[in-house]
């Protein structure tokens, strides 16, 4: 629960400013995806993440565009970064880079209660 509160506090300014996210979706496995327009690996991974979320009602995708922000302000060191949260809002894992297989592995772990 501590992780969920931290994430909400970090993302609250985005939500208040009409940003792309409102934090983890209650009762769903949530992918918080940090990306930027200029990021070539992001362009490769975006369609796969969108497909995962659109084909599975248990998965919510929250995209955070860092095109005009710094990665450090969100604790992100490189793009793309995907943070996978379980249904309870606890962080299951973080994937740095365009490794969709690793994201799917964390999603499976999150669905099984991890």
Model feature map: region roles:
Residues 16-29, 68, 72-73:
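A short beta-strand-turn-helix
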Residues 21-52:
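Local sequence-structure signature of Cys/Sec-based thiol-disulfide redox active-site neighborhoods
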Residues 44, 50, 54-58, 87-90, ...:
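Sec-exported extracytoplasmic/periplasmic mature domains
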Residues 83-114:
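Non-catalytic, surface beta->alpha helical segment in thiol-disulfide oxidoreductase systems
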């Amino acid at each position: 629960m501590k992780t969920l509160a931290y994430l909400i506090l970090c993302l609250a300014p985005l939500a208040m400013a009409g940003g792309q996210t409102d934090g983890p979706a209650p009762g769903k496995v949530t992918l918080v995806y940090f990306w930027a327009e200029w990021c070539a690996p992001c362009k490769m991974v975006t369609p796969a993440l969108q497909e995962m979320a659109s084909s599975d009602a248990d998965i919510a995708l929250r995209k955070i565009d860092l095109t005009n922000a710094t990665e450090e302000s969100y604790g992100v060191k490189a793009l793309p970064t995907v943070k996978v949260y379980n249904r309870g809002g606890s962080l299951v894992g973080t994937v740095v880079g365009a490794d969709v297989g690793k994201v799917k592995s964390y999603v499976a772990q999150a669905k099984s209660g991890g």
